[in-house]
């Protein structure tokens, strides 16, 4: 597969959190929601995590307990992937959590690395020492499993997400 990050002009931009889902500046946010739902269906094999745009927008607009922000990777006007970052508003917070989502047809082409670089940059700028992510996988995935360092669950060792995260230094 061609590496999009090397062959196409792609840009990474901060996702604007619009006032409403039908606002003029909502397009990238809405595409992020679409991609999040496509990733859930592809990776988990079901849509029980499906979220409607208004539901996700409410979550992003509520910054009471968590600062939430995101970045999208675009080719021209096409949103190819996004990353959602969550940082606790507790004064002693040291962790940034993230959900990295690349539209399934564009996976494995260098976009994941571009988005992860934004997570790492944001963590450095905020002085956060720990980066944590969550993965989705099919519950019936065959093969060996790895126990994450957090102790939460286990992930399929042969899963593409697991391989990417291990190659990126996650344990």
Locations of regions flagged by a protein language model:
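A short acidic/small-residue loop/turn micro-motif
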Residues: 87-89
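Short amphipathic alpha-helix that is part of the acyltransferase structural core
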Residues: 2-59
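Acyl-donor-binding surface of acyltransferase catalytic domains
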Residues: 1-11, 108, 115-171
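Hydrophobic residues on conserved beta-strands that form the core of alpha/beta folds
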Residues: 12, 95-97
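A short, internal acetyl-CoA/4′-phosphopantetheine-binding micro-motif in the GNAT/acyltransferase core
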Residues: 97-108, 137
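A short helix-loop-beta-strand connector motif used in the catalytic cores of GNAT acetyltransferases and
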Residues: 44, 57-72, 78-81
């Amino acid at each position: 597969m061609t590496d999009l990050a090397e062959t196409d002009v792609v840009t990474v931009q901060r996702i604007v959190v619009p006032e409403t889902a039908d606002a003029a500046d909502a397009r990238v946010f809405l595409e992020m929601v679409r991609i999040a739902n496509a990733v859930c269906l592809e990776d988990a094999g079901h849509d029980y995590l499906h979220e409607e745009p208004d539901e996700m927008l409410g979550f992003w607009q509520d910054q009471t307990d968590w600062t939430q922000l995101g970045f999208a990777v675009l080719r021209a006007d096409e949103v190819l992937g996004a990353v959602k970052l969550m940082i606790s508003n507790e004064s002693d917070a040291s962790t940034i959590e993230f959900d990295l989502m690349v539209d399934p047809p564009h996976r494995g082409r260098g976009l994941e690395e571009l988005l992860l670089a934004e997570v790492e940059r944001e963590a450095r700028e905020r002085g956060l020492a720990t980066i944590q992510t969550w993965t989705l996988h099919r519950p019936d995935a065959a093969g060996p499993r790895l126990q994450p360092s957090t102790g939460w669950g286990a992930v399929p060792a042969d899963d593409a997400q697991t391989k990417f995260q291990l190659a990126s230094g996650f344990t």
